[in-house]
Amino acid sequence: MTPFASPAGRPALLRAAVAAALCCTAGTVYAQAQQPAASTPSQREQELQNRVEKLERRIGDLESSAVLSEPETTVKRIEVYVDENGVQYTEPGPGRTPQVTYQRERTFRRQTISEKLDEAMEDAASRSVGVGVDAAIVLQNVQQDTGPDAPADGNNYQLASADIFFTAGLAQNTIFYADIVGLSGTPPDNEVGGLTLLNGYTARLVNQNELNLRESWIQTQLAKERVGLTIGRVDLTNYFDHNAVANDETTQFLSDALVNNPMLGLSENGAGLAAVYDPKNGFSAKFGYQQSSSTAQNLSDSLFYLGEVSKLFTPFNLGEGTYRVWFRTDNSSGEDQTAYGISLDQKLTASLTLFARYGEAEAGPDEDDEFYSIGFQLKNGVVINPEDAWGVGFANTELGAGDAEDLLEGYYNLRLTQKMQLSFHLTHVTEKPLGVEEVSYFVPGVRFQASF
């Protein structure tokens, strides 16, 4: 700390301090030069000259990179000694009683220019609204493989998607988030008519060719950031049934069956809450509820309750693996129905990760729907660029009513820049409707994604 001074006097104080240091150092060097030594006088003079030049460089660096801050008021805890007349002393003495008091001081603090700029930017960021964009264009083609002629055979499809999201800090450990999404184009799902979506960008969105509010919520962290609460319009698939390598349609698999477990049953985003307990030891527990119908008349209609526990393991000296188990209930059919599922991802090496999902849901008095998926992702190995990744996944869906679907997808995600990615996909899907001849398709596709 340096004593308080007016802003106009700061440069003078700085120069005076530097001049005093220079004189002191020069005097020391001169005194040393007067003492007998083995070196010649010319060597001493050269040494003195070098040290003076070094000090001048330091003065220049100090003046160009350091500033004195605006005066700051600080509160300092001090101990004083008070006699019977109330007079305060700084030293103990007869008849003096020690007391603790607080004293305010106005001081300057020397800062580098970069520190000052960082503080200003952090302060501005905490008071402003952050805006981000995640945009994608997906091109797909459908080629029928087997079965009777279908309307999708030979057709091309294009879907453009743009997410504009806003974030703002409201208080300590409390943020606001909103995501507005717009879709335009035609995915192949309208003509293929499969059990799951071949383009996961349209999942849980009702209308296309218009803007939709995907999410809007407030999140806060409590109990030393071990408990997180999110309330508003939410998408519970962001909190439940996670998977490290099969959970993101923007960078991983494009088919929705390899992004989310269809046994979760969530068809639309809606009002809800998510609570997460994470003690930072590899274990976490989650609970949430969400309405999944835009035509519901009250919060009790089409209401889903979900709970999940997860644990991080390193079995058999392998890499890290996360194992999750979830359970849900919903009344969207007019009666309470239940479902459960698991999701796991396990690293075998630093580059290779396996994944698997399973789920089962009540579909009627004596009928259950079932689903499973398996696959892998290879990253930073057998790739073109160091940050590229590719994967292969298989998913099987069987409804209690008798319909079934098999889906196989492979993709290669090419990292173009830090903000742009280009991926290539090839999907083979077989639809097996009850009582109707099965039909299968090859669906090649290209996805361009940019985020900024």
Feature-to-residue mapping (PLM):
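Repeated loop/turn-to-beta-strand initiation elements of outer-membrane beta-barrel proteins
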Residues: 172-176, 225-229, 281-287, 315-323, ...
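Detector for outer-membrane/organellar transmembrane beta-barrel domains
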Residues: 307-399, 410
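Residues that define the transmembrane beta-barrel architecture of outer-membrane proteins
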Residues: 154-160, 209-214, 267-271, 301-305, ...
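Outer-membrane beta-barrel "beta-signal"
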Residues: 376, 440-452
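Surface-exposed coil loops of outer-membrane beta-barrel proteins
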Residues: 189-217, 224-304
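Transmembrane beta-barrel strands of outer-membrane/channel proteins
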Residues: 133-141, 178-182, 229-233, 287-291, ...
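N-terminal periplasmic/intermembrane-space "pro-region" immediately following the signal or transit peptide
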Residues: 2-4, 20-23, 29-151, 169
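Surface-exposed loop and membrane-interface regions of Gram-negative outer-membrane beta-barrel proteins
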Residues: 139-161, 169-216, 222, 296-301, ...
